[in-house]
UniProtKB/Swiss-Prot annotation:
Natural source organism: Prochlorococcus marinus (strain SARG / CCMP1375 / SS120)
Enzyme class (EC, first level): hydrolase
Gene Ontology molecular function, alphabetical: adenosylhomocysteinase activity
Protein name stated in the entry: Adenosylhomocysteinase
Protein family according to the UniProt entry: Belongs to the adenosylhomocysteinase family.
Residues at which substrate binds: T67, D142, E202, K232, D236
Pfam families in the cross-refs: AdoHcyase, AdoHcyase_NAD
Subcellular location: Cytoplasm
This enzyme's EC code(s): 3.13.2.1
Length: 476
């Protein structure tokens, strides 16, 4: 269970921040220097736009895992002229040395590994709280919590009863945080909502929330869906998870993956990368899917496609990757074999019904690793309390693949900040030529040399020599 981290530093002056240990800043700065060498997309944007400063005047509220790679993103936004306030989008994902380095550089950061839910929502509020009457005019989000906070808070200003019936611990903390803010500032959220020019959203779960708001007519500003840029979803979600999933599992448990039976629930891009990683280390991998197309893809790759109900007692390693909730429910959990490893690489902790386990005996083995005794007497190993295993138990995706994602984020922030008035309150994706530009920026680093079309070849397939090369409908 989460308890507050023991050591927190807070300084108020030219910059306010909350981090676990500011003395870790020098260590963080050394790792930032290494990461910069692995993030050619972001560094190219600094070179290209550093003099122009297209984000001058942007006040960005950032809610995204406070990692070393995110530190490079933050400093790129600042180099391009933005003011930034930052919180993590997950209670376990912060790398404390990264937070310290960015805070020491003068950026207000509110993040530490092992936040309580109350702290989490307090920190998310902190990125919305700017000096004077100012608030953020841009949101950079991962999972939709910052965006959702502004919108739910605005609803609560008009009708406080929307906060009357929290359904879980997360909502209890969220609703209490909103009520506390409204007790001192009754128009806080609506003021912020009016000045937001747009939001850029990093991940599948947050994008789903945005499309639902659009469908319901509740999206109050334009949004760019960064997740569905090809250079994000087909790289971060697939190749990033292929490396970081097993990193998290092995750091947490030290188990031999070879010879184990693993079940990946969900075979989207995240599930595909997760399945590859487990198979690559010698596990027998099964897939559970609701989508017939994804299920057929899995079967054609040689995976056995199964129902969780039919195989739950056989599985050594469970990985959820769906973006849905309670895909592993209480009935599944109590049937698991002794020492089964249970993990999630989707966004939220409700993919696994962790709440239903609270009445059982928990033994904390080390941070983010818990032994839970079931009624059968079997014990399961729950990783990161059902939150993101790759960030809770390891350090997330490698720098190079995050450079793809974060280059898209910077381009999306520039687009909405400079041209937000030309967008309706809908969800958009970046155009194909920018997607291809992001890819180009990363080729030299890995020694990839592009072939060039002749004019005759370009004319034959009816594309410009310099691209874009594919239609918007093309599926990579």
């Amino acid at each position: 269970m989460v308890t507050a981290a023991a050591s927190t530093s807070q300084v108020v002056g030219d910059s306010d921040f909350v981090v676990a240990d500011i003395t870790l800043a020098d260590f963080g700065r050394k790792e930032l220097a290494i990461a910069e060498k692995e993030m050619p997309g972001l560094m190219s944007l600094r070179d290209k736009y550093g003099q122009e400063k297209p984000l001058q005047g942007a006040r960005i509220a950032g809610s995204l895992h406070m990692t070393i790679q995110t530190g490079v993103l933050i400093e790129t936004l600042v180099a391009l002229g933005a003011q930034v306030r930052w919180a993590s989008c997950n209670i376990f994902s912060t790398q404390d040395h990264a937070a310290a380095a960015i805070a020491k550089a003068g950026v207000p950061v509110f993040a530490k590994k092992g936040e309580t839910l109350s702290e989490y929502w307090s920190f998310t509020h902190s990125i919305l709280e700017w000096s004077g009457e100012q608030g953020p005019n841009m949101i950079l989000d991962d999972g939709g919590d910052a965006t959702g906070l502004v919108i739910l808070g605005s609803k609560a200003e008009k009708d406080i009863s929307v906060l009357d019936n929290p359904s879980n611990e997360e909502e209890i903390a969220l609703y209490a945080s909103i009520k506390s803010k409204l007790s001192t500032d009754k128009s806080f959220y609506s003021r912020i909502k009016k000045i937001i020019l747009g939001v850029t959203e990093e991940t599948t779960t947050g994008v789903a929330r945005l499309y639902q708001m659009q469908k319901n007519g509740e999206l109050p500003f334009p949004a760019i869906n960064v997740n569905d840029s090809v250079t994000k979803s087909k790289f971060d979600n697939l190749y990033g998870c292929r490396e970081s999933l097993v990193d998290g599992i092995k750091r947490a448990t030290d188990v031999m993956v070879a010879g184990k039976v693993a079940l990946v629930i969900g075979y989207g891009d995240v599930g595909k990368g997760s399945a590859q990683s487990l198979r690559g280390l010698g596990a027998t991998v099964m897939i559970a899917e609701i989508d017939p197309i994804c299920a057929l893809q899995a079967a054609m790759e040689g995976y056995r496609v199964v129902r969780l109900d039919d195989v739950v007692e056989e599985i050594d390693i469970f990985v959820t990757a769906t973006g849905n909730f309670q895909v592993i429910c209480h009935d599944h959990l109590i049937r698991m074999k002794d020492e089964a490893i249970v993990s999630n690489i989707g966004h939220f902790d409700n993919e696994i019904d962790v709440a239903s386990l609270k009445s059982y005996q928990w033994e904390n083995i080390k941070p983010q690793v818990d032994h839970i005794t079931l009624p059968s007497g079997n014990k399961i190993i729950l990783l990161a309390e059902g939150r993101l295993v790759n960030l809770g138990c390891a350090t997330g995706h490698p720098s190079f693949v995050m450079s793809n994602s974060f280059t898209n984020q910077v381009l999306a922030q520039i687009e909405l900040f400079k041209k937000g008035d030309s967008y309706q309150n809908n969800v958009y994706v970046l155009p194909k030529h920018l997607d291809e530009m992001v890819a180009r920026l990363h080729l030299d680093k890995i020694g990839a040399n592009l072939t060039e079309l002749s004019k005759e070849q370009a004319d034959y397939i009816n594309v410009p020599i310099e691209g874009p090369y594919k239609s918007e409908q093309y599926r990579y």
